[in-house]
Amino acid sequence: QLPTGLYKKVLVILHDSILPYMNEPTLMIDFLTVAYGIGGAISLLALNGLFILVHQHNLEYPDFYKKLYSLLDPSIYHVKYRARFFHLADLFLSSSHLPAYLVAAFIKRLSRLALTAPPEALLMVIPFICNLFRRHPACKVLVHRPNGPEGMSEDPYIMEEEEPSESRALESSLWEIQTLQNHYHPDVAKAAAVLNQSLSEMEDDISGLLELSACELFDKEVKKKAVDVPLEFEQVRGLFGKKNDIFAEHFTLE
């Protein structure tokens, strides 16, 4: 068991400064699997190395997706390594051969956690979820279930369930995304409203959104130029004498 600080220093550089120069990268399997099981930021950082071993060296990691699913907690939208995590999660969930229940569980948990996420994270995760729907059409029952019940007394999805197959995600619906359609940030509300329509076949490019920050959003809003200057919340329809005219209620020519 290494100190947490040392784990982080090694894992940050492992995938590009250590593994490519090893004659037998598979020797790092035990180290990475132990690090992946620790949890928190260390598990997130271990994903990079594991990704290389799984895809380039045929590493078999039992319950890999169960562990990846367990990493989804409220902090995932706030951690320093958020961009790296979602980049790798996007790669791991890119296969069209993944079972629908597994992808639905990821979609549902990401959506539930999104209810308390900051706008900069929401503008990234909503297109991320849309891409999962494009890859796995069977999950679209979460937004459109033709033969489903008219209403539900409660959400069947079990957020606390650690096993994705037992979470009952496919029986649920994405009411969380519908809630985000009323978000205070107009860009978030607009992004969430995309699911009200048929999705295009082409995936959204989220690479430019992974490292989006609150400062960038603020600067974007500050630099916006208003087309119409907001002078009054109720437009004047006339001057004196017209029925129900606000100006005439307070002033008179007499």
PLM segments and residue spans:
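Extended alpha-solenoid helical-repeat scaffolds
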Residues: 1-95
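Eukaryotic scaffolding regions of large macromolecular assemblies
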Residues: 58-254
